[in-house]
């Protein structure tokens, strides 16, 4: 039996039974008793399946049915929409309204209601069959749409996985409803499912095509942007390299990069001139060439000032001049008295921004007063006693961790040693006598390897020692290490047992090199260090010393909880540092064993011309003799 036939049957039954229905307003019959109402509800619950929405209304309502309630839920919302013409639909809707009521308030007879329920059960079966038909139709639509979208998906699968997902999403049918939602919406969905299927398949094809085109455009744009970014990264990398070079080398790096950039500007200008027909830019070329020459001259001044060749910039851009060679080979090396830390002296305050470093800068009272005030503030927040004990118990451990993290890359090779200490230069000459050099606190070999590299003395023996085992390993494992002349061992200068380093006999060392090592010892270790140092030095030997000076920029910059005691600090990595004055250094070394040869303070003003900053650095340098 079809749905249309069922509706017609409902209409005929309603006409036949219309006279039997009594209007409560006109006849004023009393309502059914409670027992009859209960029996009616029991019959309803047993006879009507719960899947049909109409049953729920009759189970929860009394016999008297309000026409307004029935109007809110007409039967046509619960029945599937048949594929019939418009006239059948209108007739069906009219008959359904008649089933519910014949007037404003209809009193339904129990027998009539049971007959109606039996017919409606038949309608529920039809509804179930129509639901199954709609599910089958939906599955067929899904298969059709999937079949349409599959070729596009295969094309787009090679390009991008996201396209495949979008095509699949476009071709898939709508999500399944729950049973109650399906019963409520089945009529509307059946009427439009064919149209939706066609639209879905069309959208799948259009979506896959549009996504393919948009994805291809995006990929092309990404490639273009990536090329641009790579070009910018390369440019920035070159700038960063020149910047880092300038930071690591106070004088040479900045001017060398400036020279390179100035030369590049000249080259760029020449390229532009070729395209500027008839335009004379000779004046600009001459100006840039003059600027380049000035930068070259400044670079050569910096090289002479530092006393070393430039190995950080463009070697083709800056070549050594006769002035540089004569300065380093003639006037400076071999000169022992007095110390000469540099030649660039600041005579006029207005010239301070002309260079990035000035030598022999005397501190005024204002600078000293500012440094003392900052140090007083540091004393208000010293290192706690518990932490102080940890830092002082095993200082070698913190230096070992330091070299584990930084390896040999932290400090630069000290190529200025043979200029500031000509005795080292004399010891490495080919015609020099047999000599033993002992570097204490060798670290990663930044002093050891420059001496070994320049050595021409077949009778030279150089020993490197450090109390950090990892530092000694770095020296031994370096490609520059030459066991023919060099030896490396672990040794603590302030060891309380007075043990000598491995491979060193008592009073066998001619020159002891102490470059930035003595500052790592605590003041209560100085006396023991002097005893051990005296044991290894020959009579007539020398001690070469350089370390941090009092009021140095690094001392003034220390923050809270860093000061251990006067002029003695702990860094953030746990390593300790002391800042010496000439008076304190003289007191330590000449107290018992050694004689003062010379002591000097290297004061230098570093200038950040871009940020207009002045930074005062201070180092103490000395040579001590061992009595005969």
From Swiss-Prot:
Q: Which domain of life is it from?
A: Eukaryota
Q: Name one GO cellular component term.
A: actin filament
Q: Which reaction does it catalyse?
A: cytidine(32) in tRNA(Thr) + S-adenosyl-L-methionine = N(3)-methylcytidine(32) in tRNA(Thr) + S-adenosyl-L-homocysteine + H(+); cytidine(32) in tRNA(Ser) + S-adenosyl-L-methionine = N(3)-methylcytidine(32) in tRNA(Ser) + S-adenosyl-L-homocysteine + H(+)
Q: Name one GO biological process term.
A: viral translational frameshifting
Keywords linked to the UniProt accession: Actin-binding, Cytoplasm, Cytoskeleton, Methyltransferase, Phosphoprotein, S-adenosyl-L-methionine, Transferase, tRNA processing
Q: Which residues bind S-adenosyl-L-methionine?
A: 399, 403, 441, 466, 492-493, 515
Please list the residue ranges that the record marks as compositionally biased, kind Basic and acidic residues.
1-18, 32-42
The UniProt function text for this chain reads:
S-adenosyl-L-methionine-dependent methyltransferase that mediates N(3)-methylcytidine modification of residue 32 of the tRNA anticodon loop of tRNA(Thr) and tRNA(Ser). N(3)-methylcytidine methylation of tRNA(Thr) requires the N6-threonylcarbamoylation of tRNA (t6A37) by the EKC/KEOPS complex as prerequisite. N(3)-methylcytidine methylation of tRNA(Ser) requires the formation of N(6)-dimethylallyladenosine(37) (i6A37) by MOD5 as prerequisite. Methylation of tRNA(Ser) is also stimulated by SES1. Binds F-actin and shows weak F-actin cross-linking activity.
**What other note does the entry give for this protein?**
N- and C-terminal domains are encoded in separate ORFs that are translated into one protein via a +1 frameshift. ABP140 mRNA translation follows a cotranslational transport: mRNA is transported to the distal pole of the mother cell, independently of the SHE machinery, and follows a translational coupling, in which ABP140 mRNA is tethered to actin cables via its nascent protein product and is transported to the distal pole by actin retrograde flow.
Q: Per the similarity annotation, which family is this?
A: Belongs to the methyltransferase superfamily. METL family.
Protein name (database record): tRNA(Thr) (cytosine(32)-N(3))-methyltransferase
Species: Saccharomyces cerevisiae (strain ATCC 204508 / S288c)
Query: Which lineage?
Result: Eukaryota, Fungi, Dikarya, Ascomycota, Saccharomycotina
